[in-house]
Amino acid sequence: MANNIYHYYVEGDDEKKVIDTLKTSMQLIISGKVDVFNVIERKFTRNQIMRLKQGTIVVLVFDTDTNQVDTLLENILFLQKQPIVKKVICVPQVKNLEDELLRSCNIKQIKELTGSKSNSNYKHDLIQHKNLSNALKTHGFNIEKFWCKDPS
């Protein structure tokens, strides 16, 4: 695994912040480049793929709170056909990042994680958070409960 190149595609800046934290300061997931690209709504292009290094493992992180899967399926098939892509890994968030964090931390409301005044401020506060790894640890983050629920 140490020689593999990983490239994460995530839905938004909040997912990017969480993945960057999990792979760097917390060292809970494999390191790799992280780009914001909503694979449920947008299609990959050849130009995007040309920027990848040979043998890249592509990790798609996406919400499951939508029934629109056609573009996602097209993206998976497109990536699987690219010789530069070694493997495609899908990480469904059930139903979204907030639900994943609620499930994997000892919190009742998402605002508790960031100390936000309201749940609606959570995303902004998470993205701006200076020490997310500490906040996750303080609230008992359990990686084994994160991204583990079956989306069915």
Model-derived segments and their meaning:
Residues 38-42:
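Nucleic-acid-processing active sites and adjacent nucleic-acid-binding tracks
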Residues 2, 16-32, 43-59, 64-152:
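C-terminal accessory helical subdomains adjacent to catalytic cores in phosphodiester-
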Residues 5-16:
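N-terminal beta1-alpha1 ligand-phosphate binding loop
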Residues 6, 33-36:
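Conserved helicase/translocase motor-coupling segment
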